[in-house]
Amino acid sequence: MIQSGIGHLRAIQMRSVASEVVYKRLGGEPLAVRAVVGRTVFRSTDADGIWTRVETRDFIVPKEQLPFEPQVGDEVEFLGATYEVLAPNGEPAWRWSDAFHTAYRIHAKHTGG
């Protein structure tokens, strides 16, 4: 029941709040997908006790729209700006957006445009 509810909500999300983005795999062809745009704040402490805060632009893309796992170095174009997929502070470059693995939450940083 929860899984079907998540599927239903994901469909509403894609119709209502998702934006068109272009995903470019490193060395691959551009792929137009719909993504919900968000952010994640990562915090860590280095060996000297200094706090680091990194904020990423996140793109939540349904798994069926992206036929491969996102990789560090891939790029996302959104509203004329380019974002590079990255792994901040040793974190993974992406996470599953939910417990049923229906969408990638891809972490990226603005690099130009």
Label every PLM stretch briefly:
Residues M1-R25, E29:
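Active-site-proximal polar cores
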Residues R25-G113:
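Short, conserved turn/kink motifs that form compact alpha/beta structural patches or helix kinks used as
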